[in-house]
């Protein structure tokens, strides 16, 4: 299964590579083989990149799940206007080889949605969180608030977000993607009990990032 957010890019890539493949037939053999090989590799990588495997929802109302596949780059305390004082920032780095479909971390309603144009610093640069192009999203329910950002990077220059203000969402739902790698920052309220550590690998919609106390399924 392939991500619907990448269908246009995937179609363009396939057509371009197909054209290059057949044009290579008119070239000398020494040039023909590398062009055909490169075209085939580009097609295979595109198909691999835009894959969209099924995920099993956690099914626990107290769980805040990872919004992205990747590796936890940073965990630190921070104050934030949406989640309040003593919140926790968890940054997830997505390499070009991760699944790039993003998923909702918690049940609730979208109450904040804001796009910020910006730079394209490397995802490992901590300034990328504030300086890079990003889409900020805030979700709240009767018990809690969660804020997260799709952050573009040096290679990832296309953020896709199919959310609207006041939209009701459920944890694990697909909502967009960041094409060709970068990071996703999630900010959790002070009462959230962090359930992972730096270096941990995550799976969107399945890995529990934190738990909210006194909330039952």
Curated annotation (Swiss-Prot):
Q: What is its EC number?
A: 4.1.1.65
Q: How is it modified after translation?
A: Is synthesized initially as an inactive proenzyme. Formation of the active enzyme involves a self-maturation process in which the active site pyruvoyl group is generated from an internal serine residue via an autocatalytic post-translational modification. Two non-identical subunits are generated from the proenzyme in this reaction, and the pyruvate is formed at the N-terminus of the alpha chain, which is derived from the carboxyl end of the proenzyme.
Cofactors required: pyruvate
Q: Which residues form the active site?
A: 182 (schiff-base intermediate with substrate)
Q: Which reaction does it catalyse?
A: a 1,2-diacyl-sn-glycero-3-phospho-L-serine + H(+) = a 1,2-diacyl-sn-glycero-3-phosphoethanolamine + CO2
- This protein's record includes keyword Iron: no
Q: What is the predominant subcellular site recorded for this chain?
A: membrane
Keywords, ordered alphabetically:
Cell membrane, Decarboxylase, Lipid biosynthesis, Lipid metabolism, Lyase, Membrane, Phospholipid biosynthesis, Phospholipid metabolism, Pyruvate, Zymogen
Q: Where is this site: Cleavage (non-hydrolytic)?
A: 181-182
Q: List the Pfam families.
A: PS_Dcarbxylase
The subcellular localization recorded is:
Cell membrane
Q: Pyruvic acid (Ser) occurs at which residues? A: 182
Query: What pathway or pathways are given for this protein in its record?
Result: Phospholipid metabolism; phosphatidylethanolamine biosynthesis; phosphatidylethanolamine from CDP-diacylglycerol: step 2/2
The biological processes this protein is annotated with in GO are: phosphatidylethanolamine biosynthetic process
| Keyword field contains Nucleotidyltransferase | no
Q: Name one GO cellular component term.
A: plasma membrane
Q: How is the cofactor bound?
A: Binds 1 pyruvoyl group covalently per subunit.
Q: How does it sit in the membrane?
A: Peripheral membrane protein
Query: Mind telling me which InterPro entries this protein's record contains?
Result: PS_Dcarbxylase, PSD-A
Gene Ontology molecular functions? phosphatidylserine decarboxylase activity
The record's listing under NCBIfam families reads: PRK05305.1-2, PRK05305.2-2, PRK05305.2-5
Primary role: Catalyzes the formation of phosphatidylethanolamine (PtdEtn) from phosphatidylserine (PtdSer).
UniProt similarity note: Belongs to the phosphatidylserine decarboxylase family. PSD-A subfamily.
Q: Subunit notes for this chain?
A: Heterodimer of a large membrane-associated beta subunit and a small pyruvoyl-containing alpha subunit.
Specify the protein name. Answer: Phosphatidylserine decarboxylase proenzyme
Q: Which organism is it from?
A: Prosthecochloris aestuarii (strain DSM 271 / SK 413)
Cite the source lineage. Bacteria, Pseudomonadati, Chlorobiota, Chlorobiia, Chlorobiales
């Amino acid at each position: 299964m392939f991500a619907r957010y990448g269908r246009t890019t995937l179609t363009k890539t396939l057509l371009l590579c197909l054209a290059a493949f057949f044009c290579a037939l008119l070239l000398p053999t020494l040039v023909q083989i590398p062009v055909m090989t490169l075209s085939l590799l580009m097609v295979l990588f595109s198909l691999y990149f835009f894959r969209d495997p099924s995920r099993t929802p956690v099914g626990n109302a107290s769980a805040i799940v990872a919004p992205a596949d990747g590796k936890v780059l940073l965990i630190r305390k921070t104050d934030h206007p949406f989640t309040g004082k003593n919140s926790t920032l968890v940054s997830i780095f997505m390499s070009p080889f991760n699944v790039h479909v993003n998923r909702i971390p918690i049940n609730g309603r979208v109450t904040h949605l804001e796009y910020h144009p910006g730079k394209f610093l490397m995802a490992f640069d901590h300034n990328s969180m504030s300086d890079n192009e990003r889409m900020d999203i805030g979700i709240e329910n009767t018990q809690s608030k969660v804020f997260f950002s799709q952050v573009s990077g040096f290679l990832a220059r296309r953020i896709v977000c199919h959310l609207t203000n006041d939209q009701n969402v459920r944890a694990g739902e697909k909502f967009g993607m960041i094409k060709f790698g970068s990071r996703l920052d999630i900010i959790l309220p002070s009462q959230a009990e962090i359930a992972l550590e730096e270096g941990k690998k995550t799976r969107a919609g399945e890995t529990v990032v934190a738990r909210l106390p006194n909330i039952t399924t």
